[in-house]
Amino acid sequence: MNSYKEEILQTKSDFTLKNLIFFAISTLCYKRALFNENCYKKVNFEIEHFKGADFDCQLKPTVVSLQAGVDKEADSFLEMMKTYIFSLVSMKVPFTVYLIISSQCKSILEDDAVEKEIFSFTINPGSEEKICCESFVSYQRSERFVIKLFLSGNVKTECKDEEKVVQIITKMERFQLSKGEATKAGVFLNTVETKDCMSWLNRGEFKDIVSFYESNNGIAISHCSHAFVPISTEKIMINKESSLFDSQEKIDSQLEKFLQPLKYDEIGSTQILDEQSVEKSLSQGKCEKMQNESRGLREIKNNNPCEEVKKSNWLKKNISGSDKVDKAEKKKALLNCECGDSTEDSEMFQCERCDGWVHCACYGFESDSDPRQPNQLLCYTCLLVDSESSLYDRMTMLVAYRRAIRCIWASEYQGFQKLAARLNCSYADAKRIEERLVNENIIYKEKKRKWIYFTNKSPEMVSYLREKYFTPSRWISHLNFQNYRQENQRVNMRSFLRPERMEVIERPKKVSKTSNTKETDTMKPLRI
């Protein structure tokens, strides 16, 4: 009976210590707006259990706890904190947690010029159950930050005491409550068993702290003795991290089939074509198939050397001749949208890396004032061509399909011949786009006029296109790119996707013709 009571008391003590650590770190993250504001939940907890400037009783700070299922970065940070911190609590050993917030990731603690803020949480299960939070370095708010969580504890073994250190790094864009912006990022995990890493703890010198950097062999750690320990990237990534993005990696079978690289088959034409144009398109399709069978929907503009030579010669000629180049001509020369359409729109974005202009609709944005646009937009060529070549081919096809929807929404569909000329693709590819538009009921024909296509601009079609095609980060969000933010709530904004307004024409009512012989004040006799 006595042993049963002791187990209950120990479990209650562990639960209290876990709550103390969890609420302390969550409150610090909340006060510095490190995650989405919807991730935090207010809890009724006594502030007397905490010590430190951030937990002053006179200021009456709000104690919160991190909630899962809202922000991916918060979920990853929460899982790692529960896995490693709570395991040390259950081991009944004294340890210290160091929470480091910095503006850079590479050598953030060796450089004094780097803005950073370090918090230490001392936990001793045998002493009074209080969390002492100390801040070491002043920190100025920055747009980017890095969270580093160090855990140190003495674990007693049969042979000797070993000191284990767990380093958790969460790298992301700063979440600003005023603008409501957030960006996805990666989460790295590192586990090291050494005493050299913790030599700075006793002296309190930050220049000897462990530094974190990326190398060709993976992730490496720099010790105070200037020795490097390379660690493979496969061990660093968490197994549970894949489950966080499973829902984003699932693509419906119909769209996945369309996004695969197309094969150039014969044209099942339903419209009148000249014999020369048909032979030319078929021969062009066969040549392209022999050259590169895994290419995307169209010939990529950047892979055409003749076009690049003309473009470079044109720029050199104009820049050498006159220092002031016309903005319109320069913009047209730098138009580098993957859709293949060289036509300028009133709503376009410029890539931050290559200065090329792309259409807003081709990237899933409904206008240049779309609140889902990132602060620094990169085109798919700069973003995917080197790292994700297969995804780049599929996104190129999706861009062409978005461009086709944008064109037929502005003006009626005029056949796949003109669509092929506009998208700079073959007739076979344009015919495939037309068939998909018809299958999805985006364009349709009437019985009386079967040779004319009409655009379906119903409210149901608008919601369908927004959900399936005009969601900017839908197909690349699982890759965790930093320049695409999370989806914001849709607000009233300018958009080309507007349902068609049905004009109601009031027709005059028919008046029954009656002959009246008597003349009254309200009714006059009809003139025959």
UniProtKB/Swiss-Prot annotation:
Pfam families: HORMA, PHD. Gene3D superfamilies: HORMA domain, Zinc/RING finger domain, C3HC4 (zinc finger). One of its GO terms (cellular component) is linear element. It is found in: Nucleus; Chromosome. One of its GO terms (biological process) is meiotic DNA double-strand break formation involved in reciprocal meiotic recombination. It comes from the Eukaryota. Residues 11-212 form the HORMA domain. Zn(2+) 2 binds at residues 351, 354, 379, 382. Coiled coil: none annotated. Zn(2+) 1 binds at residues 337, 339, 359, 362. The keyword Cell wall biogenesis/degradation does not apply. Facilitates initiation of meiotic recombination and DNA double-strand break (DSB) formation at DSB hotspot sites by enhancing the interaction between rec10 and rec15. This is Linear element-associated protein hop1. It comes from Schizosaccharomyces pombe (strain 972 / ATCC 24843) (Fission yeast).
